[in-house]
Curated annotation (Swiss-Prot):
Region named Disordered: 332-370
Localization terms from the record: Membrane
Stated name of the protein: Translocating chain-associated membrane protein 2
SMART domains referenced in this protein's UniProt entry, alphabetically: TLC
Glycosylated residues, chain numbering: N55
Domain of life: Eukaryota
Pfam families noted in UniProt: TRAM_LAG1_CLN8
Transmembrane segments: 23-43, 76-96, 120-140, 160-180, 192-209, 215-235, 251-271, 288-308
Family: Belongs to the TRAM family.
Membrane topology classification: Multi-pass membrane protein
Species of provenance: Mus musculus
Main localization (coarse): membrane
Length: 370
């Protein structure tokens, strides 16, 4: 991992060199961009990497407000923050997770899952706090109608656009991390599934101008995932601790219900009542019946798939639990053979011979015939 002292050196630009120094390489790239801000010739290009693009001034009653919309240049900004996320990933791994895992003495399989849950817990907790702050400051909680009113929501505030760029950067950085962390081949398909699922939903909400609904749904989803990974980490520390898993199981089903309800209310009923129902990609308007059905179908299929995986894992967990309980009952039900009582002769042993209490041998002496 990055930033640690190494005694072994690898050939320059070899596979092992890149894996062990990927965060240092990323730090050098970020430093080059920051140095570019110091010179007038390269400052404009450097700002392209750092700041969100496509800003526009919208006149208001008092003054002008700067808003943003999306475009191809967002890919450059996302790439820059992918590199920054890789650096933060390495810092969390080395200075937090590695120190904790050394004390727990985990196996290789559990160590891999511990690192995965540790990284995702840090991300989900920070994303929940960030998302909640954006939702409160934008006033989406106090005015639920704002989720579909004035659609399409083409113009975004700085914090909303930056939040979406940060989310896309994090989940895109997870793809090369599968290579950098040397994830086992058996774990790669499972991790690719939820990475692609997040990328699909976040990109869809961003490009289809459903950013307000996307913020609410991400807040619900991230809160549930944070509870799951927290329960998983506590389980590694104490295998008998199942309370957080039980709490997560209850919250998981409720979250699926809330997500489906919000999606149906916003897309199925809210957008259906908006007057502007014309398919116009140039203006960012996708409020037509086929588009709404496609959005709802995507959300419903994703939630049904997550619920099916949850039920399947819970049933497997219960089967394993009852097998262990039945095995314990069988062991306790097996009758033990009664212990044989050995009759001890009076006296004590000396050199393998039983002596009587008066010091003589307990064996009967043969009388010599006269």
């Amino acid at each position: 991992m990055a930033f640690r002292r190494r005694t072994k050196s690898y050939p320059l630009f070899s596979q092992e060199f890149i894996i062990h120094n990927h965060a240092d390489i990323g730090f050098c790239l970020v430093l080059c961009v920051l140095i570019g801000l110091m010179f007038e010739v390269t400052a404009k290009t450097a700002f392209l990497f750092i700041l969100p693009q496509y800003n526009i001034s919208v006149p208001t009653a008092d003054s002008e407000t700067v808003h943003y919309h999306y475009g191809p240049k967002d890919l450059v900004t996302i790439l820059f923050y992918v590199v920054i996320t890789i650096i933060f990933h390495a810092v969390v791994q080395e200075y937090i997770l590695d120190k904790i895992s050394k004390r727990l003495h985990l196996s290789k399989v559990k160590h891999s899952k511990f690192n995965e849950s540790g990284q995702l817990l840090v991300f989900h907790l920070s994303a929940v706090a960030w998302c909640f702050y954006v939702i409160v400051t934008e006033g989406y909680l106090t005015n639920p109608r704002s989720l579909w009113e004035d659609y399409p929501h083409v113009y975004l505030s700085f914090q909303v656009k930056f939040f979406y760029l940060g989310q896309l950067a994090y989940w895109l950085h997870s793809l090369p991390e599968l290579y950098f962390q040397k994830v086992r081949k058996e774990e790669v398909p499972r991790q690719l599934q939820y990475i692609c699922l997040y990328l699909l939903h976040i990109t869809g909400a961003y490009l289809l101008n459903l950013s307000r609904l996307g913020l609410i749904l991400l807040l619900l989803q991230y809160s549930t995932e944070a509870l799951f990974h927290m329960a998983r980490l506590f389980h590694f520390a104490d295998e008998n601790n199942e309370r957080l898993f039980n709490a997560w199981a209850a919250v998981f089903g409720v979250t699926r219900l809330f997500i489906l309800t919000l999606a149906v209310l916003t897309i199925g009923f809210g957008l259906a009542r908006v007057e502007n129902q014309v398919f116009d990609p140039e203006k960012g308007n996708f409020n037509t019946l086929p588009c709404r059905l496609g959005m709802l179908l995507l959300v419903c299929v994703a939630q049904a798939w997550l619920m099916w995986r949850f039920i399947h894992s819970q049933l497997r967990h219960w089967r394993e639990y009852w097998k262990e309980q039945s095995a314990k009952r069988r062991v306790s039900a097996v009758p033990r053979p009664p212990a044989k009582l050995l009759k001890r002769e009076p006296g004590y042993h000396e050199n393998g011979v039983v002596k009587a209490e008066n010091g003589t041998s307990s064996r009967t002496k043969k009388l010599k015939s006269p």
